[in-house]
Protein backbone atom coordinates (compact mmCIF):
# COMPACT_ATOMS: atom_id res chain seq x y z
CA UNK A 1 0.00 0.00 0.00
CA UNK A 2 2.84 2.37 0.88
CA UNK A 3 4.55 1.58 -2.41
CA UNK A 4 1.34 2.31 -4.33
CA UNK A 5 0.92 5.58 -2.45
CA UNK A 6 4.51 6.55 -3.20
CA UNK A 7 3.99 5.84 -6.90
CA UNK A 8 0.80 7.93 -6.92
CA UNK A 9 2.49 10.84 -5.15
CA UNK A 10 5.44 10.67 -7.55
CA UNK A 11 3.10 10.65 -10.55
CA UNK A 12 1.22 13.66 -9.21
CA UNK A 13 4.48 15.49 -8.56
CA UNK A 14 5.70 14.80 -12.10
CA UNK A 15 2.38 15.93 -13.55
CA UNK A 16 2.52 19.10 -11.49
CA UNK A 17 6.09 19.79 -12.54
CA UNK A 18 5.19 19.22 -16.18
CA UNK A 19 2.23 21.58 -15.94
CA UNK A 20 4.35 24.24 -14.25
CA UNK A 21 7.04 23.85 -16.91
CA UNK A 22 4.52 24.36 -19.71
CA UNK A 23 3.11 27.39 -17.90
CA UNK A 24 6.45 29.23 -17.77
CA UNK A 25 7.92 27.78 -20.98
CA UNK A 26 8.84 30.78 -23.20
CA UNK A 27 7.74 30.68 -26.82
CA UNK A 28 8.39 32.77 -29.90
CA UNK A 29 11.54 34.20 -31.44
CA UNK A 30 12.36 37.89 -31.54
CA UNK A 31 11.81 39.39 -35.04
CA UNK A 32 14.90 40.76 -36.81
CA UNK A 33 16.06 44.18 -35.68
CA UNK A 34 15.88 45.42 -39.27
CA UNK A 35 12.08 45.02 -39.35
CA UNK A 36 11.40 48.41 -37.76
CA UNK A 37 13.45 50.18 -40.44
CA UNK A 38 11.43 48.82 -43.37
CA UNK A 39 9.04 51.23 -45.05
CA UNK A 40 5.65 49.64 -45.47
CA UNK A 41 3.13 50.16 -48.25
CA UNK A 42 -0.36 50.62 -46.82
CA UNK A 43 -1.92 49.83 -50.22
CA UNK A 44 -0.10 46.52 -50.56
CA UNK A 45 -0.78 45.78 -46.90
CA UNK A 46 -4.50 46.32 -47.47
CA UNK A 47 -4.33 43.82 -50.34
CA UNK A 48 -2.57 41.29 -48.10
CA UNK A 49 -5.13 41.84 -45.34
CA UNK A 50 -8.00 41.10 -47.72
CA UNK A 51 -6.24 38.11 -49.24
CA UNK A 52 -5.44 36.64 -45.83
CA UNK A 53 -8.94 36.98 -44.41
CA UNK A 54 -8.05 39.56 -41.75
CA UNK A 55 -11.01 41.77 -42.59
CA UNK A 56 -13.50 38.91 -42.95
CA UNK A 57 -12.62 37.37 -39.58
CA UNK A 58 -12.18 40.55 -37.58
CA UNK A 59 -15.30 42.39 -38.73
CA UNK A 60 -18.70 41.45 -37.32
CA UNK A 61 -20.64 42.52 -40.37
CA UNK A 62 -23.87 40.77 -39.40
CA UNK A 63 -24.13 42.97 -36.31
CA UNK A 64 -22.96 46.17 -38.02
CA UNK A 65 -19.54 45.97 -36.38
CA UNK A 66 -16.88 48.48 -37.36
CA UNK A 67 -14.15 47.27 -39.74
CA UNK A 68 -11.55 45.18 -37.88
CA UNK A 69 -13.15 45.90 -34.48
CA UNK A 70 -13.58 42.17 -33.87
CA UNK A 71 -16.47 40.41 -32.19
CA UNK A 72 -17.19 37.85 -34.90
CA UNK A 73 -18.20 34.51 -33.35
CA UNK A 74 -16.39 31.46 -34.72
CA UNK A 75 -18.25 28.34 -33.63
CA UNK A 76 -16.18 25.15 -33.50
CA UNK A 77 -16.42 21.73 -31.86
CA UNK A 78 -14.06 23.06 -29.19
CA UNK A 79 -16.30 26.00 -28.31
CA UNK A 80 -16.87 29.52 -29.60
CA UNK A 81 -14.00 31.85 -30.38
CA UNK A 82 -14.47 35.60 -30.76
CA UNK A 83 -12.16 37.52 -33.06
CA UNK A 84 -10.31 40.36 -31.29
CA UNK A 85 -10.20 44.07 -32.00
CA UNK A 86 -7.45 44.94 -34.50
CA UNK A 87 -8.04 48.68 -34.71
CA UNK A 88 -5.56 51.25 -33.45
CA UNK A 89 -7.35 51.61 -30.11
CA UNK A 90 -4.60 51.45 -27.48
CA UNK A 91 -6.71 49.70 -24.85
CA UNK A 92 -8.82 47.15 -26.73
CA UNK A 93 -6.98 47.04 -30.04
CA UNK A 94 -3.37 46.95 -31.18
CA UNK A 95 -2.62 50.67 -31.01
CA UNK A 96 -0.05 50.19 -28.24
CA UNK A 97 1.82 47.47 -30.13
CA UNK A 98 5.15 47.81 -31.91
CA UNK A 99 5.79 46.34 -35.35
CA UNK A 100 7.79 43.62 -33.57
CA UNK A 101 4.75 42.75 -31.44
CA UNK A 102 2.67 42.62 -34.61
CA UNK A 103 5.18 40.36 -36.36
CA UNK A 104 5.28 37.87 -33.47
CA UNK A 105 1.50 37.78 -33.31
CA UNK A 106 0.94 37.29 -37.04
CA UNK A 107 3.80 34.92 -37.87
CA UNK A 108 4.24 33.06 -34.60
CA UNK A 109 0.92 33.30 -32.79
CA UNK A 110 2.47 34.89 -29.71
CA UNK A 111 0.95 37.85 -27.87
CA UNK A 112 3.01 40.85 -26.69
CA UNK A 113 2.81 39.28 -23.22
CA UNK A 114 4.37 36.07 -24.53
CA UNK A 115 1.18 34.00 -24.41
CA UNK A 116 0.15 31.65 -27.25
CA UNK A 117 -2.87 32.41 -29.39
CA UNK A 118 -5.36 29.69 -30.23
CA UNK A 119 -4.91 28.36 -33.78
CA UNK A 120 -8.44 29.53 -34.58
CA UNK A 121 -6.23 32.46 -35.58
CA UNK A 122 -4.49 30.81 -38.59
CA UNK A 123 -0.99 32.05 -37.79
CA UNK A 124 0.55 28.73 -38.92
CA UNK A 125 -0.24 29.85 -42.47
CA UNK A 126 1.16 33.34 -41.93
CA UNK A 127 4.63 32.25 -40.86
CA UNK A 128 5.60 32.44 -44.52
CA UNK A 129 5.01 36.21 -44.63
CA UNK A 130 8.25 38.04 -45.38
CA UNK A 131 9.49 40.97 -43.30
CA UNK A 132 8.30 43.27 -46.09
CA UNK A 133 4.85 41.66 -46.00
CA UNK A 134 4.69 42.35 -42.27
CA UNK A 135 5.83 45.95 -42.74
CA UNK A 136 3.14 46.46 -45.40
CA UNK A 137 0.42 44.91 -43.25
CA UNK A 138 1.47 47.05 -40.30
CA UNK A 139 1.32 50.18 -42.44
CA UNK A 140 -2.21 49.23 -43.52
CA UNK A 141 -3.44 48.50 -40.00
CA UNK A 142 -2.15 51.86 -38.82
CA UNK A 143 -4.64 53.54 -41.15
CA UNK A 144 -7.59 51.84 -39.41
CA UNK A 145 -9.45 54.26 -37.09
CA UNK A 146 -9.33 53.36 -33.40
CA UNK A 147 -12.50 51.72 -32.10
CA UNK A 148 -12.98 50.95 -28.38
CA UNK A 149 -15.09 47.82 -28.97
CA UNK A 150 -14.33 45.46 -26.07
CA UNK A 151 -12.88 42.04 -26.78
CA UNK A 152 -15.17 39.17 -25.87
CA UNK A 153 -13.82 36.16 -23.99
CA UNK A 154 -13.79 32.83 -25.78
CA UNK A 155 -16.44 30.35 -24.62
CA UNK A 156 -14.46 27.13 -24.25
CA UNK A 157 -14.88 24.16 -21.95
CA UNK A 158 -12.23 21.96 -20.37
CA UNK A 159 -9.52 21.24 -21.38
CA UNK A 160 -9.55 23.73 -24.25
CA UNK A 161 -9.76 26.76 -21.96
CA UNK A 162 -6.33 25.92 -20.51
CA UNK A 163 -4.20 28.05 -22.80
CA UNK A 164 -0.85 26.78 -21.51
CA UNK A 165 -1.57 23.44 -23.19
CA UNK A 166 -1.14 25.20 -26.52
CA UNK A 167 2.60 25.23 -25.92
CA UNK A 168 2.65 21.44 -26.14
CA UNK A 169 0.45 21.57 -29.25
CA UNK A 170 2.86 24.02 -30.88
CA UNK A 171 5.81 21.74 -30.20
CA UNK A 172 4.03 18.75 -31.71
CA UNK A 173 2.29 20.25 -34.71
CA UNK A 174 3.35 23.80 -35.60
CA UNK A 175 5.27 24.06 -38.88
CA UNK A 176 7.58 27.06 -38.70
CA UNK A 177 9.28 26.54 -42.05
CA UNK A 178 9.42 29.53 -44.35
CA UNK A 179 8.24 29.77 -47.94
CA UNK A 180 10.63 28.39 -50.54
CA UNK A 181 10.35 29.33 -54.19
CA UNK A 182 10.75 26.76 -56.93
CA UNK A 183 13.37 28.15 -59.35
CA UNK A 184 12.08 25.86 -62.10
CA UNK A 185 8.67 27.54 -62.03
CA UNK A 186 7.53 31.00 -63.08
CA UNK A 187 7.06 33.96 -60.75
CA UNK A 188 3.29 33.65 -61.18
CA UNK A 189 3.39 29.96 -60.26
CA UNK A 190 5.42 30.68 -57.14
CA UNK A 191 3.09 33.53 -56.22
CA UNK A 192 0.12 31.20 -56.57
CA UNK A 193 1.80 28.63 -54.36
CA UNK A 194 2.49 31.29 -51.74
CA UNK A 195 -1.16 32.38 -51.73
CA UNK A 196 -2.49 28.81 -51.51
CA UNK A 197 -0.08 27.46 -48.89
CA UNK A 198 0.47 30.48 -46.70
Region annotations inferred by a language model:
Residues 2-30:
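N-terminal type II signal-anchor transmembrane helix
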Residues 18-23, 98-112, 125-151:
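C-terminal capping alpha-helices of c-type cytochrome domains
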Residues 27-50, 168-196:
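Electrostatic cytochrome c docking/interface patches
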Residues 40, 44, 85, 97, ...:
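Extracytoplasmic/secreted proteins, especially bacterial periplasmic and envelope-associated proteins
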Residues 43, 61-99, 117-131, 155-165:
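Gly/Gly-Pro-rich "capping" loops immediately C-terminal to redox-active cysteine motifs
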Residues 45, 51-61, 102, 137, ...:
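The canonical Cys-X-X-Cys-His
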Residues 57-63, 107-108, 122, 142-143, ...:
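Detector for the c-type heme attachment site
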Residues 112-115, 143-152, 182-194:
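Inter-heme linker and motif-flanking segments adjacent to c-type heme-binding CXXCH motifs
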